[in-house]
């Protein structure tokens, strides 16, 4: 195999929009329509799958360095989880530390501060990820995590806490976009789901740690000190990741975009230490093949024209709608209200240590995210969603019925000083447990696979758009929750979430294709005609058939 793999052959006649790409830096030629059908470049046969991808993927073996790389990148997920989960335990401890007892509105604004910051962090750092690079975008997120935690811990007024939460949110939003994007671009196809899932698992793990520390502090630490320490502890993992980022490489795709092909090759060699030089050259060729489309689009179109292209070009639009919809519906389930307001809601139910009770959904979520990420590459993203989302519907139906009878004596409202029926409180907690199990297996980690659906030239921006949709939905839920409990009651509030879950299930059924077994650069083909539910299955069948034929021939 030649080591100078810098020419990509055109698709055979009969293929869609024949394309010739010469990758040489001096003479890059791509037909005008290339970025209209990017990622459908140069197959070596008449099927949908590039044989080179099959050959290269089957040489992948996970190395100790790659495990280190994933572990460091996944700290971003832990930070995300800790800093979103700690507010539920910390807010009840604030008491009069800021000069007065926090009102429901102030609690909602403080809680929503991180979400608002995350919207800006996701949109700004996400869209700049190609220019900054994945690595530097994560470093900026770490600085935001650190600064936000310090500001909050040193606060003596509500506005100061809100500012700190906004800054912290920039880090959360940036991490939510960049970490799964970075991991997905580096991970072998066969284990990509588990690798991205490792970051997704660290989110609920961070929430468990936050709930556990919060429960301990509520039980034995003076409140006026405890809430400051809880927020301040977020500095530790952000500084650790900031220091370890020095040892992580930039994404090879970004290095090729910058014309640093030798650095990209060295990066691939370091990640895939067991691969031969020929396989590394083949991997580099594949990266160059898809990067060519990106450079063409960025060169030929202005930022405004590219932004317009995301919505006028149907394959781009379908991909963005698919991932944005799933991310938004994941928030509209209402799960995060159990984290943000765990201390408040379980306190209203009469439990003395609300933070300790909040460990129930946090621990269960972490456990079932771990199970989900362990099987996602074998079972598939779509199949998990189709199979287990109905369990969430059943659970919230139970929740609604339980809340109806629980709050009947108080006119449908949860009142702080009322002694509710112990069996009915247990029924509510049981329904929440039942809800968290399918949520952990589905939305909790699958929403973070968004980069799998997006072709390279819109991957960073598309991830930013979908994650922004996620945080906008989160904002609506978190800001409105306490007010909804007052106006609609618990029964009406969870009835609303049940409606969103049902609509989300219909969306997944028609608009969320399977990406299991397909490389991150192949999946863009799914959306050429429609949302590609059947096409994705066809691509996987053809890929498996070709791989079987290829390796049977070798034997």
Swiss-Prot record:
Alphabetized UniProt keyword annotations: Cell membrane, Membrane, Transmembrane, Transmembrane helix, Transport
Mode of membrane association: Multi-pass membrane protein
Extracellular side: 83-108, 164-165, 222-228, 350-355, 407-427, 483-487
Stretches of the chain found on the membrane's Cytoplasmic side: 1-61, 130-142, 187-200, 250-328, 377-385, 449-461, 509-555
Induction: Expressed during growth on inositol and during sexual reproduction. Expressed during infection.
Chain ranges passing through the membrane: 62-82, 109-129, 143-163, 166-186, 201-221, 229-249, 329-349, 356-376, 386-406, 428-448, 462-482, 488-508
GO annotation, cellular component aspect: plasma membrane
Alphabetical list of InterPro entries matching this protein: MFS_dom, MFS_sugar_transport-like, MFS_trans_sf, Myo-inositol_Transporter, Sugar/inositol_transpt, Sugar_transporter_CS
Main location: membrane
Keyword Amino-acid biosynthesis in annotation: no
Molecular function GO terms recorded: transmembrane transporter activity
Reaction(s) this enzyme catalyzes, per UniProt: myo-inositol(out) + H(+)(out) = myo-inositol(in) + H(+)(in)
Protein location: Cell membrane
GO biological process, one term: myo-inositol transport
PANTHER family, per the entry: PROTON MYO-INOSITOL COTRANSPORTER
Family per similarity comment: Belongs to the major facilitator superfamily. Sugar transporter (TC 2.A.1.1) family.
Protein purpose: Transporter for myo-inositol.
Name of this protein: Myo-inositol transporter 2
């Amino acid at each position: 195999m030649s080591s100078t793999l810098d020419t990509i052959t055109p698709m055979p006649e009969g293929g869609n929009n024949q394309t010739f790409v010469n990758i040489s830096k001096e003479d890059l030629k791509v037909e005008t329509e290339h970025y209209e059908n990017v990622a459908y470049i140069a197959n070596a046969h008449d099927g949908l799958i590039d044989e080179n991808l099959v050959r290269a993927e089957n040489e992948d073996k996970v190395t100790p360095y790659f495990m280190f790389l994933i572990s460091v990148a996944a700290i971003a997920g832990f930070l995300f989880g800790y800093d979103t989960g700690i507010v539920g335990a910390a807010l009840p401890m604030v008491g009069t530390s800021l000069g007065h007892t926090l009102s429901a509105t102030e609690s909602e604004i403080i809680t929503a501060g991180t979400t608002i910051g995350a919207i800006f962090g996701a949109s700004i750092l996400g869209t700049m990820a190609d220019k900054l690079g994945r690595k530097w975008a994560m470093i900026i997120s770490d600085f935001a995590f650190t600064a936000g935690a310090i500001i909050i811990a040193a606060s003596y007024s509500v506005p100061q806490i809100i500012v700190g939460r906004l800054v912290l949110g920039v880090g959360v939003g940036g991490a939510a976009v960049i970490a799964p994007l970075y991991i997905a671009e580096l991970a072998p196809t066969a284990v990509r789901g588990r690798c991205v899932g490792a970051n997704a698992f660290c989110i609920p793990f961070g929430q468990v740690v936050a709930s556990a520390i919060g429960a301990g502090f509520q039980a034995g630490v003076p409140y006026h000190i405890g809430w400051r320490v809880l927020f301040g502890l977020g500095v530790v993992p952000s500084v650790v990741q900031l220091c370890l980022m020095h040892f992580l490489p930039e994404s090879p795709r970004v290095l090729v975009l910058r014309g640093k092909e030798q650095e990209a090759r060295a990066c691939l060699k370091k990640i895939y230490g067991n691969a031969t030089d020929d396989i590394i050259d083949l991997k580099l060729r594949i990266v160059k093949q898809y990067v060519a489309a990106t450079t063409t689009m960025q060169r030929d179109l202005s930022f405004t024209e590219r932004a317009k292209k995301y919505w006028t070009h149907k394959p781009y639009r379908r991909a963005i709608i698919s991932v944005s919809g799933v991310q938004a519906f994941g928030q509209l389930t209402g799960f995060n209200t159990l984290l943000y307001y765990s201390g408040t809601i379980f306190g209203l139910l009469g439990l003395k240590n609300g933070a300790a009770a909040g460990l129930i959904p946090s621990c269960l979520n972490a456990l079932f995210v771990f199970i989900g990420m362990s099987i996602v590459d074998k079972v598939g993203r779509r199949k998990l969603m189709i199979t287990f989302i109905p369990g969430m519907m059943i659970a919230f139906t139970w929740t609604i019925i339980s809340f109806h009878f629980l709050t009947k004596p108080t006119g449908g409202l949860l009142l702080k000083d009322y002694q509710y029926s112990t069996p009915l409180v247990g029924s509510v907690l049981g329904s929440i447990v039942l809800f968290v199990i399918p949520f952990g297996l589905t939305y909790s980690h699958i929403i973070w696979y968004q980069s799998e659906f997006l072709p390279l030239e819109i991957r960073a921006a598309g991830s930013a758009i979908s994650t922004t949709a996620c945080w906008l939905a989160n904002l609506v839920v978190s800001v409105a929750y306490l007010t909804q409990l007052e106006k609609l009651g618990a029964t009406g509030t969870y009835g609303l979430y049940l409606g969103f879950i049902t609509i989300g299930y219909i969306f997944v059924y028609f608009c969320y294709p399977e990406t299991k077994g397909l490389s991150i650069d192949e999946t863009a083909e799914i959306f050429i005609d429609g949302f590609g539910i059947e096409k994705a299955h066809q691509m996987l069948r053809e890929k498996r058939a070709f791989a079987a034929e290829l390796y049977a021939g070798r034997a």
